[in-house]
């Protein structure tokens, strides 16, 4: 999967970025980046010196060129940030087009009123039919529909949304293609999922991450040290010059140029662009991150917790067969199972109704006509069912639930599961299916097999995660036998069976207490506490509203294997920042040895050449040529690295040691060699053109 644009910078983005480049020259905006603010002040000061000298009739070509190239340095850094913001803003503009004035069909009593979507409040009930735009975020209360979510996800294929289960959430701005659904609004206007997406992808509102703040403080500290060092140079030079009977020629523009070349302007100029582009690259993979911190954490995660239903499996467990107890007719079991599921709006419940109808021709019945009282599923009992009444009295009590819950239920009634059915339950579990038991009164009628379907391609994806050093753990409420079978089929490293929201939360806290960073993928309301606690919580877009609010990332494609791309982008972000920091500091070392010998080469000279000139390995033309060449190189290296900052360095699933050695060789050694070559080439060009 590759959503990278074929055109690296599109024309509209480029035009707006150029305009914003000059807008960012505002001193308040420049002060947010301490290193580049020094360059900004230096450009102002050298410009003032040039015009002051010009006012007194002194024209200095050198001072003019220094001023221009210092301004170019500031502008190139502004341009890098503006381009990164522009690429994210293009996505924002397309989302804003989706947010239009939608007329909602609000249900008031038994009547439908047409009202503007902007007036809807939490709890309002709306009706959406084929061709309608969904007016706001909500949960489907009744019905099933095919929905076009291309305006949000970019995917043209429609998706199914239905009441019950983990596919009940709908997003404002999407379009109903078929059928009719009743929706309860769950978000106020201005706080919808679409509004959140727009706010998140707007680069101007992006907050710096703790790592960015720490790196900015480090770069500021280095800049302060270089500032003190450069300020002391005139005193040192004056002392040495007097001792040798010479004069020191260190003008203020030369000192400012030296300072700008020594401070880490490269990484400082690209730092914001790297962070913004990390979020923008996620957006290209249809993942919305609520913070840059989540992206950074994704690059460092150690353990990935995966919810089974809807994440590893397709999420729609289907009833496959009925297994009656001894002495029970299979058709009777199917009839009772259907009765227990008539009011069950979950996909599993509906599949039981359909299986009974398809296999035995048992037609659906109206529970209200039968005086039926539906018993909804309870997290405490882990059972559901129905009480059938006659003249107000319960005459049939039917229950449906997992093995342990029915086992405990029968135990309270003085009954137990037969050895034959226990064997059936174990067999069903061992092949990765879920056994659901049906009882009537105190009698166990049999077992229904619900089959989980594992999503394709996961095994290979999890193998790639393993190479990255990430351990995968599947979390499920199923019994250990079923969990083990599905875990083996999916290829995860470990599993946690019979999990509850509390055990998920406990598992995450235990791993975090050991110093591990934990990522959690989920889509259900019961996943919300774990998603909120985890360092990286990726909620599926097909999941519930609660899950989407709890996670700090949302996968619009609802593809759990997308975490590999998320991890790669996180690692790319960290590695790109580290690599360019290494390159920038290595540049400073190289420029130090390039400029200082040229400045002080004539000191202690007996003739025209002093002993310090031996350090002038590059044999630069003159003092001014050396300084100007270094300033030009320092400015040009920023736009040269913009593509790398925006795209990120190439990541391969290698060991940390190999990656470190590789990047030190490329960006460390390369960062020292390239300035020598670049500055020398510029020096030769300046000499050839006669500019100095």
From Swiss-Prot:
Gene name in the database record: kdpB
Transmembrane regions listed in the UniProt entry: 35-55, 64-84, 213-233, 254-274, 592-612, 626-646, 672-692
Name recorded for this polypeptide: Potassium-transporting ATPase ATP-binding subunit
Family: Belongs to the cation transport ATPase (P-type) (TC 3.A.3) family. Type IA subfamily.
Assigned EC number: 7.2.2.6
GO MF annotations in UniProt: ATP binding; ATP hydrolysis activity; magnesium ion binding; P-type potassium transmembrane transporter activity
Substrates-to-products reaction catalysed: K(+)(out) + ATP + H2O = K(+)(in) + ADP + phosphate + H(+)
Membrane topology note: Multi-pass membrane protein
Main location: membrane
Positions of ATP binding: 344, 348, 377-384, 400
Active site: 307
Keywords: ATP-binding, Cell inner membrane, Cell membrane, Ion transport, Magnesium, Membrane, Metal-binding, Nucleotide-binding, Phosphoprotein, Potassium, Potassium transport, Translocase, Transmembrane, Transmembrane helix, Transport
Entry GO CC: plasma membrane; potassium ion-transporting ATPase complex; potassium:proton antiporter complex
Residues that bind Mg(2+): 523, 527
Gene3D superfamilies: Calcium-transporting ATPase, cytoplasmic domain N, Calcium-transporting ATPase, cytoplasmic transduction domain A, HAD superfamily/HAD-like
